[in-house]
Amino acid sequence: MPASAKDAPSWVLDPVHTRVMFAVSHAGFSQALGTVSGSTGTLVFDPDDWARTRLDATVPLERVDLGDPSWNRAALAQRLLDTQAHPLARFTSESAIPTDDGQASVCGELTLRGGTRPLCMDVTVNAVKRHPMPPFRRTAGFSATAVLSRSHFGIVAWPSVIGDEVTIRIEAEAVRSRLAEPEPEQEQEPGALQ
């Protein structure tokens, strides 16, 4: 690990509260919307020093949901995502450059369908604080957006029906690594005293 990230706080992505959403043109009529749940990964992050940020995240593509079973099967099939051969997408960051208060451009490499290409995300920190619900873990919340070309990853089928530009939106939460975080003081769950 680079020296700049060595002593920064370490976090683990919360797969329950992390969601990848995407939008792509459906023959010019509308934007087809999909989601992917269950992402996992590790994060090194200090809100006071973006340069120390390191992210390694994995997205389980078999959980793509376009809201329709037939669409889902088509998206996962060999001509598009080919999840049988490439079940995971992975993003590893290489740099994080602050752009505004609580915001940064996080750039790295995205591996998708066997191809690896550079990708930059615009990231906003929503909150860094102890979660109000048990087990009261210190939690960081983020929103991020990015745009990619599906053809850059070899996904070229049905160009007259599916647009090439894919807009990505991510809502993510990460909790402090248990090894890095001291045990919180005991707190009552809301309603416990009633």
What residues fall within each predicted segment?
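Low-complexity, acidic/polar, glycine-enriched regions of mature
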Residues: M1-Q194
